[in-house]
Amino acid sequence: MGIKGLNAIISEHVPSAIRKSDIKSFFGRKVAIDASMSLYQFLIAVRQQDGGQLTNEAGETTSHLMGMFYRTLRMIDNGIKPCYVFDGKPPDLKSHELTKRSSRRVETEKKLAEATTELEKMKQERRLVKVSKEHNEEAQKLLGLMGIPYIIAPTEAEAQCAELAKKGKVYAAASEDMDTLCYRTPFLLRHLTFSETKKEPIHEIDTELVLRGLDLTIEQFVDLCIMLGCDYCESIRGVGPVTALKLIKTHGSIEKIVEFIESGESNNTKWKIPEDWPYKQARMLFLDPEVIDGNEINLKWSPPKEKELIEYLCDDKKFSEERVKSGISRLKKGLKSGIQGRLDGFFQVVPKTKEQLAAAAKRAQENKKLNKNKNKVTKGRR
């Protein structure tokens, strides 16, 4: 699910922490990718012309494999060396979120049964997409044959991606989930595995710039994210993103905020603290997650197993042999070239001061107001 409203807060208060770039900008980088999130994207986005999922003659879904094969090739073509991280067992605290998802699934199935148009049916079917154990296993088999390393995390894939980045095994963690920032990955890449046809730039978020720009410690940032709404517990009812940030900056921790609300000083009867709120346990899952020590992991990219890859994709899954062979050639070329040095590796980046970050935030807000006024003028002329 990620963190509700966090991207908007960063965009408004620390716009310089988000850099939008073309995929070519990451040439020479190693990246740890949240595999479960990517597979979910592929199952939704990689479709036939009629909107249905891709399948082979036996009726087996192949959208996830098509997405994994060709999106990985795109990264390799652009000089990126990806490794994928799969979710392990979810933390016990996540059970409440999984229960909510199950309830929503039942409701969606009901809406699908009642749908009368093909468009509505397609919409509800996409909401029912779920990454299964079989999808994960098939993707892992494909990556092994392609020569791309993968890891099965003890629990959350995002936490393991962040660990690899923190230990210097990769440059960044790649996921659509903003909660990856809570694990203090140096950089978070969003939209990396999107289709090229979307023309969506990759968003690179600098975690340390976010912390400095918001003037929060990592502990306070995690508390903010819990207040905004995360997968591990409920948030304070009635408190939106703007108020959550204000409360954290004023009081410094959830404990102090709870004291403030319970004392009656807030004069706000709409704010409701959840009963038996496990925010402390949620905080520790972010600050001290269960991961494999990055120093113990050796990432290795190997030449693709050409014969086995053709058998798996072409014979078993009925992919086009011509296209698969072309993909194998691209893989061989990309993986053989290795990681070349980047010019920015020879220069030390000078951290931005609080004043510079504040000035950038002010400029962004002024531009936002200017664009709003322009839109009003345009509408008035119509």
Swiss-Prot record:
Named cofactor requirement(s): Mg(2+)
Localization, UniProt: Nucleus, Nucleolus; Nucleus, Nucleoplasm; Mitochondrion
Binding locations of Mg(2+) 1: 34, 87, 156, 158
Keywords: DNA damage, DNA repair, DNA replication, Endonuclease, Exonuclease, Hydrolase, Magnesium, Metal-binding, Mitochondrion, Nuclease, Nucleus, Phosphoprotein
Basic residues bias spans: 370-382
Family per similarity comment: Belongs to the XPG/RAD2 endonuclease family. FEN1 subfamily.
Protein name: Flap endonuclease 1
